[in-house]
From Swiss-Prot:
Positions of K(+) binding: 178, 180-181, 228, 231, 233
Mitochondrion listed as a keyword: yes
Protein name, UniProt field: 2-oxoisovalerate dehydrogenase subunit beta, mitochondrial
Organism per entry: Bos taurus (Bovine)
Enzyme class, UniProt record, top EC level: oxidoreductase
InterPro entries hit by this protein: THDP-binding, Transketo_C/PFOR_II, Transketolase-like_Pyr-bd, Transketolase_C
Amino acid sequence: MAAVAAFAGWLLRLRAAGADGPWRRLCGAGLSRGFLQSASAYGAAAQRRQVAHFTFQPDPEPVEYGQTQKMNLFQAVTSALDNSLAKDPTAVIFGEDVAFGGVFRCTVGLRDKYGKDRVFNTPLCEQGIVGFGIGIAVTGATAIAEIQFADYIFPAFDQIVNEAAKYRYRSGDLFNCGSLTIRSPWGCVGHGALYHSQSPEAFFAHCPGIKVVVPRSPFQAKGLLLSCIEDKNPCIFFEPKILYRAAVEQVPVEPYNIPLSQAEVIQEGSDVTLVAWGTQVHVIREVAAMAQEKLGVSCEVIDLRTILPWDVDTVCKSVIKTGRLLVSHEAPLTGGFASEISSTVQEECFLNLEAPISRVCGYDTPFPHIFEPFYIPDKWKCYDALRKMINY
């Protein structure tokens, strides 16, 4: 009883700390005030710090898909889900709190529009959410499951790796759950700490039978998500949550598709190939501009977009041209997907390399809270690695 009383007292103290304290279960989820967070307890004299480590660079307005509308990334996701529910009467969306719109508001308004039988809440049980989605998909319906944070996808690991990914193979294609798509907010957010900032894509890159996708912008998010939902394989769609409100650009209102497993060369160059996905794409775009301005170095920038299966041909073709490769991601260095890219390029392009391949990634530590600015692979770390490659 003493332990229970002590725990209750601890909770009350946290609650008394207010909305900016650790009382919030969803630490780091409240983005409505933007990415400028107070240094908190120092009153009016408190300094404010900019935690966003990048500048979002919108793509040119698309003209081939009809009418466009200004959307941020979460609105683009909502638009894709709306299009899917309207087009496919079997499509259902489910997960923790999705009925009222979700933590990040990605499903707001969909329950009112399509009804509680098609957009509904589930218990807080990630293994159950994915298992339920597999069952729905096996019947031929379209299942769109939401895991509230990518950090909490691990309880569902067995269902994804041993069930969803292998269902078609173990039945000789008599049964499949290819109409399952799992959405999840992903990556650092500026103040998410240990359990709301992780980038677990590499865990699933070792799992044949599924596809893993990470967009960099609202336009990319809608097109790639629609492609995942319509794909014949189970897909995991990781959404960079720091971009939910920070990324704004023109997005087509009508549905459209962006091919999976096809990287995009955002900027052509001749001296160095820079590869990233998600938020980190905007970091390396800044690095490319710095390299051109300060060093006179021409960088080719590639957004990988699909982690599994990834576009080997586009990356290797670029490295054969430039002779140098830098890969960057937020996840820890050891065992990160940059290692797979580096290994493949080493095998395919060895005689073309002018310098060792460089990986600029997160540290091999749990994701820190107040030290997040030191943890993330920002433009200065990437620029330093690029300069060393050029001088090799």
